[in-house]
Amino acid sequence: MMLPRLLLLVVASALPLASVAAGAVGVGEGFCSAEPSAASGGCSGVRPPLYWKATNPTLAPAHLQDLPGFTRSVYKRDHALITPESHVFSPLPDWINTLGAYLISPAIGAHFTMYLAKMHDGSKSALPPKGVERLIFVLQGSILLSEESGNTHTLLVDSYAYLPANMKHSVISDEVTTLVIFERRYTTIEGYHPDLIVGSTDKQPLLETPGEVFELRKLLPTSLPYDFNIHIMDFQPGEYLNVKEVHYNQHGLLLLEGQGIYRLGDSWYPVQSGDTIWMAPFVPQWYAALGKTKTRYLLYKDVNRDPLI
């Protein structure tokens, strides 16, 4: 008679533990294998912010703390892969309450700079050097862009602004905000002058890509006043570039969503959201999208100027 009572006590005492375990599954990842993508929301059904993995990558620096000395970053003569665990943030010159990490600069042979700016409550930008144009793209948070004329623009995630060289402006933010910024010394053509442009990716039309399968948007006009452009390129899983590109243009790339394999020269790199790539002129380059979600990357490209200039 004692055995049934003992079993009953064991089962009863285990019930609270089972409830706790079930609760843990409910609040954690549990058995859900779905990624919380912008489309599905994962198990919780709550959609994460756009480009959340660009600022919170799968292999974030915190995940690599138990691998001292390990990095996926690579620097070679004609290309570089800069991954998040290698980012070094420090105060940006003349900016207020803002940290920056320079990812690409003339020190590696580029004719432009590409950097991340992390703004916080009460932060404010500084102007670029004289003769330098700037493009700002919002990855996280929001900013208020003010022109010298007094006009203002609110930029949310996936919005951007192109500021011509020597145009006075300021950017402020009162929340945690991450920007990717491109700057280069403007190459003038007599009689042509670029204009201020404020826009968002989703407002840009899809462009024809003969012979290719990816979707392409361009953030700036293709006309002569503009000496560079920013391409937004989307690949579905399994899609890849048909052309194995070799050209005189330089590239600065930030992977906003997804993962895949990037060929640079004779090297093949697994890449994911948050990774940055520098491509020098004439380095062979090719990309294939892998995984379960689409790839989207942002790509700097110099255009509309004779390479001899």
From Swiss-Prot:
Q: Where's it found, cell-wise?
A: Endoplasmic reticulum
Alphabetized GO MF terms: metal ion binding; ureidoglycine aminohydrolase activity
The UniProt entry's GO CC annotations, sorted and at most eight, read: endoplasmic reticulum
According to UniProt, the reaction catalysed is:
(S)-2-ureidoglycine + H2O = (S)-ureidoglycolate + NH4(+)
Ligand binding (substrate): 245, 285, 297, 301
Where, by residue number, does Mn(2+) bind? Answer: 245, 247, 251, 285
Task: Tell me which InterPro entries the record gives.
Answer: Cupin_2 (IPR013096), RmlC-like_jellyroll (IPR014710), RmlC_Cupin_sf (IPR011051), UGHY (IPR017627), UGlyAH_cupin_C (IPR044697), UGlyAH_cupin_N (IPR044704)
UniProt keyword annotation of Cytoplasm present = no
Entries under Gene3D superfamilies matching the protein? Jelly Rolls
Q: Recorded E.C. number(s)?
A: 3.5.3.26
- Disulfide bond annotation, renumbered to this chain: none
Signal peptide bounds? 1-22
Q: Which cofactor does it need?
A: Mn(2+)
Q: Which NCBIfam families match?
A: ura-cupin
Similarity comment text for this entry: Belongs to the UGHY family.
Record's function text: Involved in the catabolism of purine nucleotides. The sequential activity of AAH, UGLYAH and UAH allows a complete purine breakdown without the intermediate generation of urea.
Put simply, this protein is called: Probable (S)-ureidoglycine aminohydrolase
Q: Which organism is it from?
A: Oryza sativa subsp. japonica
